[in-house]
Amino acid sequence: MKKQLLLLIVLACAFVTSVKAEFQLERPKLVVGIVVDQMRWDYLYRYYNQFGEGGLKRLINDGYNFENMHYNYVPTVTAAGHASVFSGTTPAFHGIAGNNYYLNGKKVYCCGDTTVQTVGSKSKAGQMSPRNMMVTNMCDQLRLATDFRSRVIGVSIKDRAAILPAGHSANGAFWFDKSAGCFITSTYYMQDLPQWLKDFNKKNKKDLNQDIAPLPIGVTLTTRIAIAALDGEQLGKNPTGDTDMLTVSYSSTDYVGHSFGTRGEKTDEIYLTLDRELKVLFDALDQRVGRGNYLLFLTADHAGCHNAKFMNDHKMPGGVWKQSAKKKELNALYAQKYGITNIISDFFQNQVLLNRAAIEAKNLDFCAVRREIAAKLAEDSLLMYAVPFEEVGSSSLPPAIRDRVIMGYCPGRSGDIQVITRSGYMDYSYEQGTTHVAWNPYDTHVPFILMGWHVNHGFTNRPVAINDIAPTVCAMLKIQMPTGCTGNAIYGD
């Protein structure tokens, strides 16, 4: 009887212990979010046999790979992409409708903020903040969950690629000032550069004293500043035990893509450099934070189209469709018809912004004129569709396109008419380089790989969307998703 009683006590203790273990909250020491500007998904395999063992191959072979990750909106541009990755939503909700967009009829830069000043140089390159983003992101949610004990830092060559990922409540975001040859920030975050960044700028002065953006050294310096931030801010070594976060965006890949396209020696060079630099970063994380102690993901803010001439040379469809030429043509037409000099104020990101004030000053019905201009645009043989934004939901657009237009439309910040070009047609140089803005897979299909803390190796080909990344990371951290989140957790379900 005593033995049976003892056995019951032991079993009861074991049960209580197991229950306690189930409810123990665990989080990694550090989260690292990496964005590679303009990285197409297929680059993972185009260069696979040329990659070393510790960079992108490590991600592919150790991480969990979402092979069918797409952007689910247009326009597919840098600012919108970075905002979407970290906020778990799209321009319709986060408000970053483009790199530049219109607010109350005035053209604004996505991160422009004249209420703050540059810290680290005498230029205006630091008059930036995340204030135009209308929602929180995963970094903000981490800060909220830990009563702001978590430390969040964002770094990139591009200001928007450092600022938008780091969120509203970041401890710091740092970007490159080409005119001064150093990394800077703004008074939104602090009044003086941290000592580690002053030391970094001084140590790397020779390399920084050039336009690093389109060069392999730009990739190298991005890695260097990421590691400098890791050390300087002691990320992953929070004295409170809370999770820290580092966001790193590699911009040089985008500059090379725009200049040289998706193929060629320069593109090869930049991605092989990226691979080597990722190994350097991963090794630093292993040494400083500990392998298995950090959660890391890699994705892209958009992809990129093959150059039109390259496609034509290989007997495939593609070409150039110039927004500026179409704007000039339509303005001339409607100046004659309605006596309005510039009925189209701007043509950007495949969107038409009409001169509402001029139209209404002529006592014309704005909606009727907008519909008329959309119909005129639709006559262009290089366009598939031209639809007023407010009529997209009831239009004949195929659902795959219609839904992307709706998710990318932000009232008051987007244009009046959305145009959809034929596949492979873009507003760019025919001979060389490329761009991105479209709904097509060449602009929307990007990598998304998780690696590290509590991540098992594997892959899936099921369709997932860019706004699923933030809720996935938040679910893994057991924190609330961002305030405008429209995606779902996709790992561990």
Walk through the language-model features, giving the residues of each:
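Bacterial Sec-dependent N-terminal signal peptides
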Residues: 1-26
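Active-site-proximal N-terminal segment of extracellular/periplasmic enzymes that hydrolyze or transfer
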Residues: 22-64, 485
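His/Asp/Glu-rich, glycine-adjacent segments
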Residues: 90, 95-242, 251-258, 378-381, ...
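Beta-strand elements within well-structured catalytic alpha/beta cores of enzymes
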Residues: 28-40, 59, 85, 142, ...
